[in-house]
Amino acid sequence: GKTRFVQETLADDYFSGGERNLVIACEEGVEEYEDELLQKTNTTLVVLEDKSEFNEMFLAECQKKYKPTQIIVEYNCMWGLDYLREMYMPKGWFVAQVITTVDATTFDVYLKNMKSLFMEMAKDSDLIIFNRSTDETPAATYKRNMRAVNPKAQVVFEKEDGSQLEFEEEM
């Protein structure tokens, strides 16, 4: 999911070449970051266990200690985006892009049980990636749901192997 996406982004020379990267992971995921990749891409990983740790003082300490030129926040959506939006960022820090990753195999369940939380996440996204998509994924329906919330977002469907799912869009 998110961790794999971040690792693929870091592995891209266009993104991380010559930069001092900082990844702030706001939850332990299923997948772990590869130490070799972190070293190769000049990336420091900081993992937080609790929302209370993610605050303005923490961000200021990260700026002072690591002096990053690029920051990726692997955010825990359960904390709510307003929490992040309202936080004072260190000088030079800004949100360049909001990317939301969605597990296509569990999207229906999330939508039924946590619709408002998910829609809040999607409304500010520049890019929404449905990963773990298959030929059975109702991609046109999912894309229509996302367009209703955020017509400006780019919506893509990615298969397990990283290739994009091709599908017919409904009119």
Segments (PLM) and residue ranges:
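Unusually extended, aromatic-enriched hydrophobic runs near protein termini
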Residues: G1, M121-D124, E169-M171
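Nucleotide-state-sensitive switch-loop elements of NTP-binding domains
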Residues: T3-Q97, A104, D108
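Residue-level signal for alpha-helical context at structural boundaries
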Residues: V23-A25, S116, E160, Q164
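A short acidic, often aromatic-flanked loop/helix-cap motif at beta-alpha or helix-coil junctions
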Residues: K51-M57, F107, T137, E160-F167
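Phosphate/Mg2+-binding loops and adjacent switch elements
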Residues: V73-F157
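Long, charged, low-complexity intrinsically disordered regions
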Residues: P151-M171
